[in-house]
Each structure stands twice: as structure tokens, then as C-alpha cells.
């Protein structure tokens, strides 16, 4: 009986990690499909800042996810230099929010 409980505990410990990995893969696929990687690298700047830079700049800002989601959908200029970020209005609000949270969480 003790072995069965230990096996269940091990499975329970593994499943949340598997769910997170699937979510990370889904978010990376959404970012790719949405064209994010045309301008942004995970760690480094391409045209726009790398996601790690974005996460570092907004760390501790409780409004960051909402403002970043808005910037994803509506575009922006001046926050990271002279090159504007084009709007992605075809991306739904929910997906924009998920992408923003993913970027802020370190991608």
C-alpha cells in the first residue's frame, strides 16, 4: 500500500510540470504564428527587445500584463527606441493577454 501511495505522489508531482511544458509549447507556437519572432528573440534583441528584456523592465509592475497586451494588439512607439511596434489587432484579447503573461513570466 505504501508503494502505491508513493507512486501516486510521484505522478502527482510530475503532472503539473507536464502541464506547464505543454502551455509553454502552446505559447511559443502562438507567438510564432502571430509573428512575434519576426522582431523579438527570446533573450536578445532582433528588431524589438528580447522577451527577457521586456520581462526585466516590467518586473514588479502589477499593470504590466494589461498594458503589454494592449500594446500587442494596438502597437506602440517610443518605449524601446525609434522603431514602432506594429499592431496585431487580429489577435484576440485573450490570446494577447496570454502572450503578455508568458513574456512577463520569462517566456
Where are these predicted regions, by residue range?
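Bacterial N-terminal signal peptides that target proteins for export
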Residues: 1-8
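The canonical Cys-X-X-Cys-His
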Residues: 34-42, 99
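Protein kinase-like catalytic domain
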Residues: 40, 73, 103-104
